[in-house]
Structure formats: structure tokens, C-alpha cells
From Swiss-Prot:
It catalyses: (2R,3S)-3-isopropylmalate = (2S)-2-isopropylmalate. GO terms for biological process: L-leucine biosynthetic process. Disulfide bonds: none annotated. This is 3-isopropylmalate dehydratase small subunit.
Length: 167
């Protein structure tokens, strides 16, 4: 494992944030990550890209990433600099797409206790999230080793290329 901790400021979103809210269908004519990043979450919060900083963390309600299957959603989040997404549950196809694109996501039932603006630290090795603002510590089930390897490689394509090269 490369990076054991993710530290960032929290941006809150509600439940059932679908892939069309993450990146609207009107932007799907491009697959250029930098272009997608300019419009991430704009239908949920038009100022999100202007307010957030690279390394910030989205904390949302249940069923994050529901709706249509589009790899553009995790690509846009990652390209915008979102370091991780935390929610009680994720739509299964988004869950898989996020790891395939190298975006760390974590399931935390108590995510509603984390407020917008809080500073948190995710310890991927030990399965803890520390809210530096409230001093609360939460436990989550660490992601499986193979999925951590996908994150470390930057996604499935990079992982496969590294395997082919024998790294």
C-alpha cells in the first residue's frame, strides 16, 4: 500500500446522489477528465468546483452514485481533486467504477455525524476515520487488498499495465 491516510475538508451531499448529479448528461460528449472536472456536482451545488480544493472529501447519504452506469462520474470526481467519497452505501455499479478509476470510497454508517467543513483523516490501513473537528473516531471495514492495489495504481487500466510490465 502506498498512501495510508487521506486528510481533507468535508463537503456534504444528501442521499440518492445519482450519476447525473455527479456529472450531468450534457457533458458526456467528452471523456477528457479535466473538462469533466469543471462540471462535477454542478447540478447538486453550482459552486462546488469553485469552493472545493484538491484533496477535499465528499461525505454523502445512502445510495451515492445511483442511476445510470457511467464511468464519467468517478473520473470527474477524481479529476476535480476529490480525494475520497464516504457514504453509508453506494450503488454497486458506481462502487465498482470508482475503484476501477482509482477513486477511494468508504462505507460508513455514521456518515451523517460528519458535518460540512469538518476536517477528517481516513486511515485506510486501520479502517478508521478521525474527525479532527469533533475528535470522534469511526471504524469502517478496510477495503480488500486487491481494491487497495487498484487505488494505489491509479485505477484498473494502470494496474493492468503495471502487471503486464511485471511491476
Amino acid at each position: 500500500m502506498q498512501k495510508a491516510n487521506i486528510d481533507g475538508k468535508v463537503w456534504r451531499f444528501g442521499k440518492d446522489i445519482d450519476t447525473d448529479l455527479i456529472i450531468a448528461a450534457r457533458y458526456l460528449s467528452t471523456s477528457v477528465p479535466e473538462e469533466l472536472a469543471k462540471h462535477v456536482m454542478e447540478d447538486a451545488d453550482p459552486q462546488f468546483v469553485k469552493k472545493m480544493s484538491s484533496g477535499d472529501i465528499i461525505v454523502a447519504g445512502e445510495n451515492f452514485g445511483c442511476g445510470s452506469s457511467r464511468e464519467h462520474a468517478p473520473i470527474a470526481l477524481k479529476a476535480a481533486g476529490v480525494a475520497a467519497v464516504i457514504a453509508p452505501t453506494f450503488a454497486r455499479i458506481f462502487y465498482r467504477n470508482a475503484f476501477n478509476m482509482g477513486l477511494p470510497i468508504f462505507e460508513l454508517q455514521e456518515s451523517a455525524e460528519i458535518a460540512e467543513g469538518d476536517e477528517i483523516s481516513v486511515d485506510m490501513n486501520n479502517g478508521t476515520i478521525t474527525n479532527k473537528t469533533s475528535s470522534k473516531v469511526y471504524k469502517f471495514i478496510p477495503i480488500p487488498q486487491f481494491m487497495q492495489e487498484l487505488i494505489d495504481a491509479g485505477g484498473l487500466m494502470n494496474f493492468a499495465q503495471n502487471e503486464i510490465k511485471g511491476k
